[in-house]
C-alpha cells in the first residue's frame, strides 16, 4: 500500500513535470514564431557600432526610424539591440512592463561606480534606495538648501568674472560642489579637494578600455575609486562617533532602519555624485548657448529675474519662494532639456522573451528607448529644430517629454537639478553678460552631447 501510494505520487509528479515542459515548449515555439523587428545587424562582432559613432548618433537613429519605423533591430557595442522611438513603446518598456526590462550597464561601469549603486538594480532593493534618495531630494528637503546653493553660485561667478572659460568644465565644478553639499552636508568642506581629485581621475577612466594594468586609465580610475570609498568610510566613522540629525543624502542612508552596509552606502554616494554632476553641467552649458543664440529670449529671462531682484533688499538672499516666481526660466530649462536631450537614450535588457506589436524582443537583448527621437518628432513638437520655450506654456502630452527618464528608474534628483540651475541663472542674467568665443556651431559627442569644445565663453560683470 505504501509502495503503491509512492508510485502514484511519483507518477503524478512526473506527469506534472512533463506537462510543464510541454507548456513551456509551446510558449517557446509560439514566441520563436514571432518575427524580430526589421533592421540590420551589420558586420560580425562589431555590428553597426562604427556607423553609430562615426557621425552624429542622432543621424543614425533618425535614418533607422525613417527606414524601419518606430521599432527596429541593430547590433551595437557588442550587443544585439532593439531600438524604440515612440512614446507608446517607451512607456511599455519603462513603465507598463518595466519588470520585464532590467537596467543594464557594461560590467566595467558597474565596477567603477559600485555594483550596489541604485542604477544597476530593480525590485525591492531598488525601491528601498529610491525612497531614501527621494527623502533627501524632494522639495521639502531641499528648500532649505537655497542659501547654500546661492553661495556656491555667487562664488563660481565671481571666479569667472573677466575671464575666458570652458563653460562645461566650470559648470562641472559648480554642480559637483552643489552635489557635495546636498549629499554630505557640512562634512563636504573637509574632503572637497580630495573628492574632486579622485572624481576627475575616475572620470578619465570611465569610458576607457577595461584593462586593469598599471599605467592604464582604467587602473588609475579603479585606484581612485578605492580612495573614494576610503574617504567615505572616514566620513561614516566620524558621523557615528558624533551622532546627530542630518537631512542630507548620507544622513538618509545612515538612518535607514533596515540598515545599509557601508559598501552599499559608498557605492550609492559615489554613483549619485557622478550622475548629479555631468548631466546638470551639460544642461547649464546648453542653456548658456541657447540664450546667447536667442537674444530676445535672454532679454525676457533677464527681465523676469530682475523683477525678483528688485523686490529684495541689498544683499538679501534668494528664497525657495523666489525660485517659484520664474515661469519663463523654467520653460527655458524645459526647452533646453528637449532640444539638447542630454540623455539621447537609455539601456534596458529583456529578462525574458517579450512580444511587442507582433515582434519578438528576445531574452538578453538590449532595448534602447530613444528619447531624442521622441523629443524631435515633428508630430509631437512642431518645428522641433527651433528653440522655443513658449511651447511649454501648454503641458506636453504624457510620455512625450522624458528628459529625466520615466517610470521607477527616472532621475530622483531632478528637483535639485532644476533648483541649482534656476539659482545660477538668476545671478548670471542679472549681474553678468557673456559671449561665445570662436565658432558657435558644432556639437561634440561623448557620454553627452555638448556644444563644440565645451562652449568657450568670455564673461564679465555688467556695469
UniProtKB/Swiss-Prot annotation:
Pfam families xref list: p450
GO terms, biological process: abscisic acid catabolic process; cellular response to hypoxia; response to red or far red light; response to water deprivation
GO molecular function, one term: iron ion binding
Keyword Membrane in annotation: yes
Protein's recorded name: Abscisic acid 8'-hydroxylase 3
UniProt-annotated location(s): Membrane
Transmembrane regions listed in the UniProt entry: 6-26
Induction (UniProt): By abscisic acid, brassinosteroid or gibberellin treatments, by salt or osmotic stresses, and by dehydration and rehydration. Expression regulated by phytochrome B.
Residues annotated to bind heme: 411
Effect of loss of the gene: Plants are not affected in seed germination, but show a restricted greening rate after germination and increase the drought resistance.
Described purpose of this protein according to its UniProt entry: Involved in the oxidative degradation of abscisic acid, but not in the isomerization of the produced 8'-hydroxyabscisic acid (8'-OH-ABA) to (-)-phaseic acid (PA). Involved in the control of postgermination growth.
Highest taxon listed in the record's lineage: Eukaryota
Transmembrane helix is among the record's keywords: yes
Tissue: Mainly expressed in flower buds, flowers, rosette leaves and roots. Lower expression in mature siliques and inflorescence stems. Not expressed in dry seeds.
Pathway annotation from the record: Plant hormone degradation; abscisic acid degradation
Keyword annotations from UniProtKB, A to Z: Heme, Iron, Membrane, Metal-binding, Monooxygenase, Oxidoreductase, Stress response, Transmembrane, Transmembrane helix
InterPro entries the UniProt entry points to: Cyt_P450 (IPR001128), Cyt_P450_CS (IPR017972), Cyt_P450_E_grp-I (IPR002401), Cyt_P450_sf (IPR036396)
Family: Belongs to the cytochrome P450 family.
Cofactors, names only: heme
Catalysed reactions, semicolon-separated: 2-cis-(+)-abscisate + reduced [NADPH--hemoprotein reductase] + O2 = (+)-8'-hydroxyabscisate + oxidized [NADPH--hemoprotein reductase] + H2O + H(+)
Main location: membrane
